[in-house]
Amino acid sequence: MPRRREVPKREILPDPKYHNVELAKFVNVLMTRGKKSIAEQIIYGALSHVEKKSGKDPVEVFTQALSNIRPVVEVKSRRVGGANYQVPVEVRSVRRSALAMRWLRDAARKRSEKSMDLRLAGELLEASENRGTAIKKREEVHRMAESNKAFSHFRF
């Protein structure tokens, strides 16, 4: 634990086009090598593809996809008497969003479409309908927590 004062959370401003804070955070997650404008182009392109394909509000599809991907529980390793146990713990709300965004990004990168905005659009549409690789990742994490429920008394 750090002995200094607690570092204040930075306030993230909403994105310029849709005025959504979660979208602005996702831009930062998607960004590589500090190229924020390219990350914004990819996301806005993906959202326009989502609007064309589904006919729904793209920001609503994005928030629905994120809420479907967010994990409720995860496992943490805990060493007890020479054995490592996978202990299920509840995920804090900030970490839920961060994990969901990371899993969405990784799932989109693994897809086979030609450009990143098409990949992201496809993954967003699938995740909003509870399908896709990112949802599989969440289910896998939940399954691990469920199978290790017996060790939940080893609290942190």
Swiss-Prot record:
**Molecular-function GO term, any one:** structural constituent of ribosome
Q: Which GO terms describe its cellular component?
A: small ribosomal subunit
- One GO term of the biological process aspect: translation
Which keywords does the record carry?
Answer: Ribonucleoprotein, Ribosomal protein, RNA-binding, rRNA-binding, tRNA-binding
Q: Which domain of life is it from?
A: Bacteria
How it assembles, according to the record, is: Part of the 30S ribosomal subunit. Contacts proteins S9 and S11.
The family database entries (PANTHER family) matched by this protein are listed as: RIBOSOMAL PROTEIN S7
Please give the function described in this protein's UniProt entry: One of the primary rRNA binding proteins, it binds directly to 16S rRNA where it nucleates assembly of the head domain of the 30S subunit. Is located at the subunit interface close to the decoding center, probably blocks exit of the E-site tRNA.
UniProt lists the family membership as follows: Belongs to the universal ribosomal protein uS7 family.
Q: Which HAMAP family match?
A: Ribosomal_uS7_B
Protein's name according to its UniProt entry: Small ribosomal subunit protein uS7
